[in-house]
Regions:
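Elongated alpha-helical scaffolds that mediate protein-protein interactions in large eukaryotic proteins
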Residues: 31-44, 51-64, 68, 72-90, ...
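Alpha-helical solenoid repeat architecture
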Residues: 63-77, 91, 105-120, 163-183, ...
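Fungal eukaryote-biased detector of long internal structured cores
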Residues: 119-121, 127-359, 363-379
Length: 694
């Protein structure tokens, strides 16, 4: 059983700040925005979008229209979609070529906010409406301006420098959002040689505002993930690699905040993305995971979510008074905060810290997902050949199905599995260090879920949707990270488990189970509720595996796992996780009744009709593991359920199930190979059990 691999598909590095589903009546409101205040707020913008507005000869009018769009769309799907219907995206893109730099800057700001709040659909619309044209033209101009400003700071007034940095930050943010929209958009970005432009900000980070440096390293992190052109560009320049190493290993200063930590986390992630480093580089000898990533990220996991929630609640209940305006503060307009209250600034700081934490967990998940490549399958191996081999075995299989005879072919021993290497002390130490931290971050808080529709109007608890969205992301990332850690931990599928790791797993089980039940019982309006539940199941599977035969199965837990696996919402992966958990719980020799209930359920995956391929194969493998030793106290259950005969009668439908696996689909070759192995194990197991005559 392999550990979960880090998934890239449709996983945004800058997730929507607040999903539409979190906003009360967000989607419904977007479909029919008739509220008077909304109409009154949007009508002037619509007028400005039309000729005489953004297309006005008056620079101030065009600037105002772009700025107003930028302000109105934040966390408001109704206004955003209303403006979309008026082609605001296309109009803003035309404003990128405005002769006024101020108008162009405001347009990039509005497009940036649309990218972050609107998600993939708006990014795709921007790409399809030709945004790459003007963006591509900006890169060399900004590079030249940046070089001039850095070499001679007095060559441009401070206000001009602020505009340049703000403009660059917006452009870079749009590009990183576009890069995650489609392969077509990514290829277009690869073609403009963006990496040197981004690295120029990182190399000169000490002279630049942190926000633009942060945007640059964020974009670099996204582009360097599974993207060979970007990876090769970074690896080919020793200066780039040295810069990333320097940022990742920089000691934390006493005044460092979320921006500084975020920059280091992203640099660390980018460094991992381009590994292994070429041998010619000095940094090639560094073990990035053990020497940089783990020592840096582990302390970040101590952040208290409950403390953050309390700070948010206190800020909402007692917002701090505005501080005296300080117009001389350098780069105060980066990012725009002129009109934000102290409470808004504080809440954004907390949200930003949560996003940094989520990103750290994402990188740590990758550290825990280092699997060796599967053995290559010879290209000349074809389905027809495999099916022919299986046909030649049918006579033998039919004998197994129909015969109890003593001379039936059998192995001397039941099917066995290669034991995984024993865990060393360093691995156990890592496990005992990370499990409590990750469990703490995965446990829902009082603000982790939006209020249900039934309680939204009567609750007195303060709510802050951006915090709720960020907390959900942290919980899911922590669970996925913990799942990878647990499922990658060396252990065997048979025989005794390591007592030290079993003790850790048993202690962690109740809290992980609480997270699962909390996610299942969360309000139906909770965005990513199913994703949270699936991640929690992955953790429980890993814990059950480490404490196989030690964990005592509880009746209500077994019933809930069966209920989840059989629900209409459960896909194959959910069923696999539930089956895996149940299979480990069934191996407690003191819980005979629970063993029987689980065995009945596992047998239902093959009899009377096989279910989906992967969960069925897992169920069969687990049945063999559970009843491999006929001397176990619970073996009486297998006999009373006539397990041997059920498995014998299942060989023909199992053969058909194996043949139905399409090797041409992603993962199909590996699944087909494993299915054939399971089929062979079932045949051997049936023969072995019949030979026992018990």
């Amino acid at each position: 059983m392999g550990k979960a691999q880090k998934k890239k598909a449709m996983r945004r590095h800058n997730p929507m700040r607040v999903p539409d589903s979190h906003i009360p009546k967000g989607l419904e409101s977007a479909a029919s925005s008739t509220r008077k205040d909304k109409v009154e707020a949007v009508l002037p913008i619509i007028q400005k979008v039309r000729p005489g507005g953004m297309n006005s000869e008056d620079v101030a009018e065009r600037t105002w229209a772009c700025a107003a769009v930028s302000n109105l769309i934040q966390n408001d799907p109704a206004t955003r979609r209303l403006l979309q219907g008026k082609n605001v995206v296309g109009t803003l893109i035309t404003r990128l070529s405005d002769p006024s730099e101020e108008v162009a800057a405001e347009a990039t700001g509005a497009l940036r906010n649309l990218c972050i709040d609107g998600g993939f659909d708006i990014c795709a619309e921007m790409f399809n409406k030709g945004i790459m044209g003007p963006l591509t033209e900006f890169i060399p101009k900004l590079s030249t301006t940046l070089q001039n400003v850095l070499s001679n700071p007095k060559s441009a007034p401070e206000k001009v420098q602020e505009l340049v940095y703000e403009f660059a930050e917006n452009i870079i943010t749009i590009l990183w959002c576009l890069s995650e929209t489609s392969n077509k958009a990514l290829n277009a970005i690869n073609s403009i040689s963006l990496i040197p432009f981004l690295m120029s900000f990182l190399i000169n980070r000490a002279k630049l505002p942190r926000q633009v440096v942060h945007a640059s390293v964020q974009c670099l992190y996204v582009l360097s993930e599974d993207n060979p052109p970007a990876i090769q560009t970074i690896r080919s320049e020793s200066e780039y690699v040295a810069c990333l190493v320097a940022i990742s290993t920089a000691p934390q200063g006493p005044n460092d905040d979320e921006w500084d930590i975020g920059i280091r986390v992203l640099a660390c992630g980018s460094l991992r993305n381009v590994s292994p480093l070429p041998a010619a580089l000095n940094a090639s000898s560094i073990d990035i995971d053990r020497s940089i990533a783990l020592p840096f990220i582990t302390p970040l996991l101590s952040y208290s979510l409950d403390g953050a929630v309390e700070e948010v609640k206190n800020t909402l209940a007692n917002p701090p008074a505005p501080a005296p305006q300080n117009n001389s503060l350098k780069f105060a307009k980066l990012p725009k905060s002129d009109d934000k209250s102290p409470a808004e600034i504080l809440l954004e700081r907390i949200e930003r810290r949560l996003r940094v934490l989520q990103l750290s967990l994402e990188i740590l998940t990758g550290v825990c997902a280092q699997l060796p490549d599967p053995e290559p399958v010879p290209e000349e191996l074809e389905d027809e050949d495999e099916d022919a081999d299986m046909d030649r075995e049918e006579g033998l299989e039919d004998e197994i199905i129909q015969s109890d005879a003593d001379d039936a072919p059998m192995d001397e021993e039941p099917p066995s599995f290669l034991a995984s290497p024993e865990a060393d002390q360093n691995s156990i130490k890592l496990l005992t260090t990370l499990i409590p931290l990750l469990l703490s971050l995965s446990t829902p808080t009082s603000m982790s879920f939006p209020p249900s529709s039934a309680t939204a109007t009567i609750t007195t608890e303060p709510t802050h949707l951006p915090t709720t969205s960020a907390l959900t992301s942290v919980h899911i990332s922590a669970l996925e990270c913990l799942s990878n850690l647990l499922l990658s931990f060396p252990t065997s599928d048979t025989g005794p488990v390591n007592p030290a790791t079993a003790e850790v797993a048993v202690a962690a089980w109740p809290r992980a189970w609480t997270t699962l039940t909390a996610s299942i019982n969360a309000p139906s309006t909770t965005d990513r509720r199913m994703e949270l539940s699936v991640a929690a199941l992955g953790v429980l599977w890993g814990l059950a595996r480490l404490a196989r035969g030690v964990l005592a199965p509880q009746k209500e837990q077994v019933e809930l796992l069966i209920q989840v696996a059989d629900s209409t919402q459960a896909d194959e992966q959910v069923q696999v996780k539930c089956v895996g958990i149940l299979g480990s719980l069934a191996q407690n020799t003191r819980e005979i009744e629970m063993n029987k209930a689980i065995a009945q359920y596992l047998l239902s995956y093959i009899h009377p009709t096989p279910r989906s391929a992967e969960p069925t194969l897992h169920a069969l493998s687990l049945l063999i593991d559970i009843y491999a030793d006929e001397a176990n106290t619970y073996d009486v259950n297998f006999r009373s359920l006539k397990g041997t005969e059920v498995l014998a009668s299942s060989i023909t439908p199992l053969r058909k199930l194996v043949r139905s696996i399409d090797r041409r689909k992603e993962g199909g070759t590996e699944l087909r190979r494993w299915a054939e192995e399971v089929e062979g194990n079932v045949r051997g197991f049936v023969t072995y059990r019949r030979k026992l005559k018990i």
